[in-house]
Design a protein with these regions (language model features):
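Non-heme di-metal
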Residues: 1-172
Length: 172
C-alpha cells in the first residue's frame, strides 16, 4: 500500500531492467519527421518550415516587447500589470523554446542536441556579444548618446557575466 495516496500494492507494477519513459520531448523533430519525408509535398514542407520559423521569431519578439511593457507599467505605478507582462513574457519564451526544439539545427546549425556542445558554442557567442555591445556603447558615448551608452554598456557587462558563467559550467 502506498503511504501517500493509499493505493493498494496490487495497482503497482515492479519495474525491472532499464526504465522507459512513456513520452519525452525530442530535439529536431522537424528534421526527423518533415524535412525528408517523401509523403509530404514540397509546398507543405515549405509552409511548415516557414510557419515554425515565423512562430519562433514572433515569440522571441513578444518576449522583448512584453518585458519592455512590464518596465513601462512598473514605472507608471502599475506593478500588478508589470508582473503580468513578465509572466506572459516567460510563457512566450517557453513557446519560443519549444519552436527552437522542434526546429533544432534547422533553426541554428551551431545548436546541437548535447549540453556540452551548446555550452561551448554559447561561451563563444557571449564573448562576441560582449565585444559587440561594448563597441556600440563606445560609439554612443563618442556621440554624446548617454542613455544608449549607459544601457548598452550595462548589457555588455551582463553578456560578460553570462560568458564567464557558461565557461565555468563547461569546465566542470
Amino acid at each position: 500500500r502506498c503511504p501517500v495516496c493509499r493505493v493498494p500494492a496490487s495497482k503497482f507494477v515492479e519495474q525491472k531492467g532499464e526504465q522507459k519513459l512513456a513520452a519525452v520531448h525530442e530535439y529536431g523533430v522537424y528534421a526527423q519527421t518533415v524535412k525528408n519525408n517523401p509523403d509530404i509535398s514540397d509546398e507543405d514542407k515549405k509552409f511548415i518550415f516557414d510557419q515554425l520559423m515565423a512562430n519562433f521569431n514572433g515569440e522571441c519578439s513578444e518576449v522583448g516587447m512584453y518585458l519592455c511593457m512590464a518596465r513601462i507599467a512598473h514605472r507608471e505605478g502599475y506593478p500588478e500589470i508589470g508582473l503580468y507582462w513578465e509572466k506572459a513574457a516567460y510563457e512566450e519564451a517557453e513557446h519560443a523554446a519549444k519552436f527552437a526544439e522542434l526546429l533544432g539545427e534547422d533553426l541554428e546549425p551551431n545548436m546541437k542536441a548535447t549540453t556540452k556542445d551548446n555550452l561551448a558554442w554559447r561561451v563563444d557567442c557571449e564573448f562576441g556579444a560582449t565585444q559587440g555591445k561594448f563597441d556600440l556603447a563606445v560609439c554612443a558615448k563618442k556621440n554624446g548618446l548617454d542613455a544608449i551608452h549607459d544601457t548598452v554598456h550595462e548589457m555588455a557587462r551582463d553578456e560578460a557575466r553570462h560568458g564567464r558563467g557558461l565557461e565555468g559550467l563547461l569546465k566542470r
